[in-house]
């Protein structure tokens, strides 16, 4: 059911995976399935990392 898109991973705790039913938007493909990475990129810590990476990569050009 998860591969068919009916269920979506809601959370993971060690070996236990929690699922929930997909919303209509998720079912139709309107919502990104890459939400974990999206939330990570939008976090304050990741923004600092990306800012430092951008500064160091700009200096090498």
Curated annotation (Swiss-Prot):
Superkingdom, natural source: Bacteria
Additional remark text: Encoded by the cryptic lambdoid prophage DLP12.
Protein name per its UniProtKB record: Putative protein RenD
Organism: Escherichia coli (strain K12)
